[in-house]
From Swiss-Prot:
SUPFAM superfamilies: WW domain. Substrate binds at residues 234, 264, 557, 587-591. Residues 16-29 have a biased composition (Polar residues). It comes from the Eukaryota. Belongs to the CAPAM family. It comes from Mus musculus (Mouse). A motif (Nuclear localization signal) lies at residues 109-113, 668-686. This is mRNA (2'-O-methyladenosine-N(6)-)-methyltransferase. Cap-specific adenosine methyltransferase activity is inhibited by zinc. It is an enzyme of class 2 (transferase). Keywords: Methyltransferase, Nucleus, Phosphoprotein, Transferase.
């Protein structure tokens, strides 16, 4: 994918006829604008504004005879007064990167009346090789107050085709959907999961928020701690590895009931969470708090007399040492803390074990009840529309095909109306008061994926409701907090994907989503919402016979371990070229089972290590985050492992030349696509945010403070 695909399209275009004094002889093809009764404020008239009528659009617009500017909405005078500042020297400066600009540089941000809305303009952005379909216009426009400078809420079907074309023209491209797949599978039948519906998704999101709140309250009330960061998200990932239930998100049929992931992360934070320490006073305070929390816990729980004696003696010894040692260094305090943890940790964990298991069990059983409620709601929606919940499976012809998106066996019910409006470069989609947001560029990406993959909605009547369900699903899966869950959805930089495709034939992502995928063929967590946008289903259910794949799994230990088992089984059973290039954290203290198994696998052809802070990931919130927050530095080493069978190694082997080019691709920072006008101060603050965000990738593996 060429680098110019990351640029922004040209949007400036003047009207054919502006000034009422323009001679008809000089521009014979340009009709004169029809003037309306001028009911404008005196300030606007003095500034050169007048009200005209658009014959083509059959509505009024506002034209400035001094600047040749045209607006659909009534202008509001801002910083740039054309009389006192005709050149706009005092106006708000535009960023040098025009891809950030969607509105004129005035405070009201009124939408320009441009020919770019009415006809395609030449630009360097990769355009789809398909025509934009004419969408139905029978749906009504919901009533909404019209605020000056803000587009009115509209239903997708009520917009004209030209305006849709302008909306669907991306300004930033971080994908290449033209690459065809080389992944071959056996022909498979449709999935039995129920099709998504906004009412069902709304109920599911409400119940997940309640479940998160239950988890927080249980941790606070029973253990006196805040929930470990991202532990609920990793609990859902770990549970879905073993879950045999019917819900695509919440677990309902798991063995064992107590989640190893949730249990491990809560126990790591008992009696208190140990954070990274930079200063001596912090180390002293942490040692005191740990000793106090350990004594309080052992006194309030049922524990053996020996355990109580050991903990209390070590705590008193620590307090005595703190009273005597006034000149201790940070290292002295940390050594003392490590000694206290070794002495008291096993006894504290034994005393808290039953309580923590109770938290895990309680959350699972609440989830089970919620799944029943969601299922009842879903079946009621199908019954209301006379759609059977079970469809008789037809016989499949045993043949090999290139992989294709997931199809659903159950027919989709009619979709309710969903509201959409655009705020600057963000598309806002609202259903029953619940709003989700996505940038215009990623909205256009979803449109393309839907156009390529969906087979039951050629008129795009269900596009917006399905986008709302998709965005709401991922929002609920990773939480609504700032930067929450973004590390679990991080992806590789564009330069790396380009290199993987060019050198190793990679055309498929094993762990992605419609929002962060680079290729149009990928596996994702949710076949019901994502199948309409190109997903081939969950990776652990996907069984290719040949092809070259990239795998960057969410950093959940149980999921990564299951991934290794799945890949080795596929490599063992296939005689066709098969290759998996896996990117996982190089956690060594202790090493993860997945990393250890891949290093010892007979299919490992090479292992590459990318040093911490010398390579980047793309944010999991790339579909909505600011441009300067799109990339962040990894705070841990990343191990790149090549798992290939014999034919795959012969075809896509990691030769020294290929490895050198792959390493060089990581040196091309994705930040170079950002605005070059950013100041050094904003860059440094952005880097700090990036590092904080990067820590989300492995909080369960954070080293103990040193």
């Amino acid at each position: 994918m060429a680098n110019e695909n990351h640029g922004s399209p040209r949007e400036g275009a003047s009207l054919l006829s502006h000034s009422p004094g323009t001679s008809s002889q000089s521009q014979p093809c340009s009709p004169k604008p029809v003037r309306l009764v001028q009911d404008l404020p005196e300030e606007l008239v003095h500034a050169g504004w007048e009200k005209c009528w658009s014959r083509r659009e059959s509505r009024p617009y506002y034209f400035n005879r001094f600047t040749n500017q045209s607006l659909w909405e009534m202008p509001v005078l801002g910083q740039h007064d054309v009389l006192s500042d005709p050149l706009g020297l005092n106006a708000t400066p535009l960023p040098q990167d025009s891809s950030l600009v969607e509105t004129p540089p005035v405070e009201n941000k009124s939408r320009k009346r441009q020919l770019s809305e009415e006809q395609p303009s030449g630009n360097g952005v990769k355009k789809p090789k398909i025509e934009i379909p004419v969408t139905p216009t029978s749906q009504s426009v919901p009533s909404s107050p019209s605020i000056p400078g803000t587009p009115t809420l509209k239903i997708w079907g009520s917009s004209t085709e030209d305006k849709q074309a302008a909306l669907l023209r991306p300004t930033e491209v971080y994908w290449d959907l033209d690459i065809q797949t080389n992944a071959v599978i056996k022909h498979r039948g449709p999935s039995e999961v129920l099709p998504p519906h906004p009412d069902v998704e709304l109920l599911r999101s409400q119940l997940i928020l309640k479940l998160r709140q239950h988890y927080r309250e249980l941790c606070q009330q029973r253990e006196g701690i805040e929930p470990p960061r991202e532990s609920f998200n990793r609990w859902m990932l770990e549970r879905k590895v073993v879950d045999k239930g019917c819900d695509p998100l919440l677990p309902s049929n798991c063995e064992p009931v107590v989640s190893p992931s949730m249990f491990r992360e809560i126990m790591n934070d008992i009696p208190i969470r140990l954070s990274r320490i930079k200063f001596r006073e912090e180390a002293k305070r942490l040692l005191f708090k740990y000793a106090e929390a350990a004594r309080r816990l052992i006194e309030s729980r049922s524990a053996s007399p020996d355990s109580r004696k050991v903990v209390k003696w070590n705590v008193e010894d620590t307090f005595s040492w703190l009273r005597k040692e006034h000149s201790a260094s940070k290292e002295d305090y940390m050594d003392r803390l490590e000694h206290l943890r070794r002495q008291c940790g096993p006894h504290v964990s034994a005393a808290a074990k039953d309580s923590v298991e109770g938290i895990c069990s309680k959350i699972y059983h609440i989830s089970l009840e919620y799944v029943k409620r969601i299922r009842e709601k879903h079946l009621a929606v199908l019954k209301e529309n006379n759609i059977p919940e079970e469809v008789e499976a037809s016989e499949l012809e045993p043949r090999l095909v290139y992989c294709y998106p997931v199809r659903l066996a159950v027919s989709a019910p009619p979709m309710p109306s969903v509201e959409m409006h655009v705020e600057n470069s963000v598309v806002c989609i609202r259903y029953k008061g619940e709003m989700v947001k996505v940038s215009r560029s990623y909205f256009s990406k979803l449109w393309l994926l839907y156009r390529y993959s969906c087979v039951d909605d050629s008129a795009f009547e269900r596009f917006l409701p399905r986008v709302w369900c998709l965005l709401r699903r991922y929002q609920m899966m990773f939480g609504v907090g700032l930067y929450e869950g973004t590390g679990l959805q991080g992806s590789l930089p564009v330069h790396v994907f380009e290199t993987l495709h060019r050198l190793f034939g990679v055309s498929f992502e094993c762990f992605a989503s419609p929002l962060n995928c680079y290729f149009r063929q990928y596996c994702s967590a949710f076949p019901d919402t994502d199948g309409y946008f190109g997903s081939r289903g969950p990776c652990l259910d996907f069984t290719p016979l040949s092809g070259s794949f990239e795998a960057n799994p969410p950093f959940c230990e149980e999921l990564m371990d299951a991934m290794v088992s799945h890949f080795e089984k596929l490599l063992e059973s296939s005689a066709e070229p098969l290759s998996f290039i896996v990117f996982i954290p190089e956690w060594r203290e202790p090493p993860t089972p997945a990393l250890t198994r891949m290093e010892q696998s007979r299919f490992k052809r090479h292992q590459l290590v990318l040093p911490a802070f010398e390579h980047e990931y793309r944010s999991g919130s790339q579909h909505i985050c600011k441009k300067e927050e799109m990339h962040y530095k990894a705070v841990h080493n990343t191990a790149v492992l090549f798992l290939q069978n014999g034919p795959g190694f012969a075809k896509w082997g990691p030769t020294p030349e290929r490895l050198q080019e792959l390493t060089a691709a990581y040196k091309q920072s994705g930040r170079s696509h950002g605005s070059s006008s950013s100041s050094s101060s904003s860059s440094s603050s952005s880097e700090a945010k990036d590092r904080d965000s990067g820590r989300e990738q492995g909080p369960s593996r954070e080293p103990h403070p040193t």
